[in-house]
Amino acid sequence: MARSLPFPAAFPAARPRRLRRDAFTRALVREHSLSSSDLILPVFVHEGENLAAPIASMPGVSRMSLDLLLRTADEAVQLGIPVIALFPAIEPHLKTVDGAEAFNPEGLIPRAVRALKSRFPQLGVLTDVALDPYTSHGQDGLPDESGYLMNDATVELLVRQAMTQAEAGADMVGPSDMMDGRIGAIRQAFENAGHIHTRIMAYSVKYASGFYGPFRDAVGSKSALGKADKKTYYVDPGNSNEALREVATDLAEGADMVMVKPGMPYLDVVRRVKDEFGVPTFAYQVSGEYAMLKAAAANGWLDHDTVMMESLLAFKRAGADGVLTYFALDAARLLKKA
């Protein structure tokens, strides 16, 4: 970071408001900006045809069948959004203790990947590597008799899931499970299979946060999880040095990009990661963050577009190279009008 210097002059020789006087000057000296290419659009997919299921806790967001996914992707491409991130809402009868549907080559996500890459080869497709949408217990891995997740056995399943996604044509995989060693295992499997171009966006710093509730509604894991939590594998919200260790480990194991999740409550961590490592760094504006802003805007307490754009710009100012956000389409539409 640049060394802090004293301001060279005092009032009235220095009048900082001169640089705020009009729109062209403010634009000229603006330090950070937001564009559509900074946005990644998360989408929830489910089975069916011409079927959209609104998510009550995420106003404006729906689970969508694959035909509707393609319509959404078309708009994303037209707006200049470079990447779509896929998340599945799996039928309850397909959920098992080991989440085996996660590595079914004819499963929902592989079919969604193939459909997207066939229709929009220029669109990046990011897939989620985690078992919680597929497990009957709502956890991100394979539990032992006490309910504690078995790390190494889970990693073996995650490798199978990541390989299934890569073979379907995913450009990027996003391991969000927080198991130890999973990045290295996935990278080695990719190398062995010749998937040398498949990128890994590691959810390196995923906090044990209360902001994930609406997402769990969306993928149908909330009821399965019940009153259990994920504190034995997600990062403690009080820790930031630990976050840096997680990032260092994932980079050493072969991650191409890293992520901090949630976003706004952890902008300090985004800044530390970017300053310490200087690698492509992303933040996830998670479902709870989105829901809070939506609720406040719906009640007239905040202006929707203003706080949406301000919140996204905050990620860029903190050092993020891009943002996964459910506001992606709305923000890109607004940017196009500007």
Can you name each region flagged by the protein language model?
Residues 18-25:
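Acidic, Ser/Thr/Pro-rich intrinsically disordered transcriptional activation regions
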Residues 2-10, 22, 31, 35-40, ...:
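Alpha/beta enzyme core
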Residues 12-18:
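Exposed beta-strand/loop interface patches that mediate assembly or binding
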